[in-house]
């Protein structure tokens, strides 16, 4: 939600997508533009669809929210490089919601930031892969080029909440620094079932 308030532009979303993206954008006074997807492209827009949508929008301060692995479909975006090329061409900002990165059916994951590092903001957290829903431990990884955007988010955040409680912070350190190969293997096995 803070990202939407800090961003003064319009949002491109693919359908289907997480149910709260649109309401959060509306609260942040961001107009939403939808791209309808299909099973043929794994429930993600094609590069052609993204380019067509960008061209159809008059305002050019845009952000595309990419959620891969996707909620609700669980699929992984397979055309990241092509989407990144379009994004670069139009200087499109991408918010890559990677909250499900460690919970994939195929156990393989790439981030669009690999192909478009200067224009991609990555968001992630513990709630999904670590079973820590409600802890509200998350992060934004922002490229240096977008440091002013990060400052806006930090300013808003400091007025919205002060910090995550100490026990949760210690648990987060263990979650991110510990070796969880066995846990992830068991989780992947459950997903395959």
Regions found by a protein language model. Give the residues of each.
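Phosphate-binding glycine-rich loop
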Residues: 1-10
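Short, intrinsically disordered, charge-balanced linker/junction segments flanking boundaries
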Residues: 2, 73, 156, 187-193
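Hydrophobic/aromatic ligand-binding patch that stacks against planar heteroaromatic rings
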Residues: 23-24, 86, 112
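Active-site phosphate-binding strand-loop segment of PLP-dependent enzymes
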Residues: 37-107
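Conserved core segment of the aminotransferase class I/II
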Residues: 114, 118-189
